[in-house]
Amino acid sequence: MSLSEFYLKYSDIRIRIAPFRTKTDFETRKTVAIIDELINRADTVNAGAYAGGRFGGAVGHTVENLMGRAEKYTSALEAGEYPLKGMFTEPGLSLIDHSFVEKDGLMHVFYNRGFIGFEWDTRYVDTIGHAVSADLVNWDIQMPCLTAERGGPDDYQTWSPGVVYRDGVYYMYYTGVNIHVAQTICLATSTDLYHWEKYQGNPVVLPGEWGEWHADRWSDCRDSMVFVDDDGTAYMYYCTARHKPDGGMETALGVASSRDMFTWKDEGAYAFDICDITLESPYVMKHNGKYYLFYTNCGHGTAYAVSDDPICGWQSLGMLIEKTGEPPMCPANVPSCAEVFCYKGQWYISSAERQPGCEQYLEIFHFTWHEDGTASVGARLE
């Protein structure tokens, strides 16, 4: 696209979305804000800004992709449609890893606040957002509840919140990332879900001897979630890497256990045959006496497994939400970050499929358990 062609298209889209700027409904405001982010990022890339991040490639951060998506959304608005209906995010942002917790009949979701058109290492993911809903469709956005902090293990970025309630306290386990991208599991607590205090003893979990962790280089220890079993034992699951018997490293699920939510015992790390690239965003729950693990199988989508033991013995049940259509432009562009939960008597599963150009939204689908212990995904809530 030549410079003159670009600015003709840029001006055309801005003129066409102008009438929608006076609309006050959330769907229109969200879509217009997304269009603005797409065309403005395309403008900087077209002017010569480096589209990649600190670690290289930036799949989808091309003028053609960014402008193409903006054109699609603009045309939909003109046709009286909401192109992002059923896909929640704060206007102008991406919603990535997330965690649900119910309180007083309302559902709270906590999430990474990402940036459209920018990789995480270009415009930092350094705040955790918060929204509340009574129906899982209409969300009331709250103030961000946690941020990166100078001098701590999260002095660069904060990722992947996982919230769990126990004995009057809400525990948020999140990934603290330092400037070298050495990742650690950190903790913040709250009694009301709005005011959070970081634990002074952070970090609370690092990989065991089966892996490696170095403060001065990239080290995998992220995407934690905590499940409290019937006997009161809390189990933490997180994305990491372990030594292979024949040398080198492989992606793995790290597990730790605790009785007090602060002190954690290493329970090892486990690999999965079905996961051929990277395992991310684990989520564990108990159903009918069995333990179910849902996780992102990068390059493919959301997979799940079952076990009689909360630590090991996981047996694959296959893919649950697969990437459809064209193959993903990069392994991260798949349905991911799933959580399964029951709300007001109905089961649901969440997903946040990353689009080329770092668009990412929260989607919630109906979810059904079957008598044989398997599950299936139904229609999306809109």
Model segments located where?
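Amphipathic, heptad-repeat alpha-helical segments
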Residues: S2-G56, G60, R69
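Carbohydrate-active catalytic/glycan-binding domains of CAZyme proteins
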Residues: H61-E382
